[in-house]
Amino acid sequence: MSVVARQSFKYSIIGYLGFLLGTVSAIFIFPFDMVFYGKLRFVLSATLMLVPFVVFGLSYSNVYFFGKAKEEGKHQNLFSLSLVGVGINFLIFLLGFYAFFYIFSSFQEDSELWDMKRLILPMVLVMSLSAVFNRYISNFKRIVVPNIFENIFPKLANLGAFSLFFFLGASEKISYAFFLGVFVLGLIG
């Protein structure tokens, strides 16, 4: 079996496992407390909505320009530049985020986004960096590992944070810290 065929098979298996984990959790576990599960889903959805503003296509530029940069021996420079770009974009995004809520201060009172900013903003940075790493590693025909981080880890984060909160009686802050910690672990991995 070739490398591509093995990677494709493993990719499919990970996808099915992610589907199975999500389905079992949604049917049997999350209905115990839909309010807290809704908060977790809001945080993840808001984060996923804001990540493209920070990444701004830099993750896909690693795939698109990788061949040319590798020919010139500068593919590591392209990767480093992408990481610096994400850092700069995140700072600009933070400036815009706080400027928006400063200018339109009435949104601060009724906005869940503003209330959850201490969790959402670090997750935006972590997931933006993860997007760059995941696309970069795909240049080396390694698609299974990023698929684990993109499909399995969010479901494990939801399930773990929910279980900590509902079944083990941990506070929301501890559950949110676990939720963020799983994504940080995915970035480190």
Predicted segments with their positions:
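Helix-loop junctions and terminal segments of transmembrane helices
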Residues: 55-70, 139
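Alpha-helical transmembrane segments and their helix-entry boundary regions
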Residues: 11, 37, 78, 135, ...
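Membrane-interface helix-capping segments at transmembrane helix termini in multi-pass transporters
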Residues: 32-42, 69-81, 91-125, 167-179
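Helix-capping/transition residues at the boundaries of transmembrane alpha-helices
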Residues: 30, 67, 138, 165-166
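Hydrophobic alpha-helical transmembrane segments
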Residues: 149-164, 168-189
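Signature of the first transmembrane helix
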Residues: 3-59, 94-98, 123
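Membrane-interface junctions at transmembrane-helix termini in multi-pass inner-membrane proteins
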Residues: 5, 65, 127-150
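Alpha-helical transmembrane segments of multi-pass membrane proteins
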Residues: 49, 53, 109-133, 184
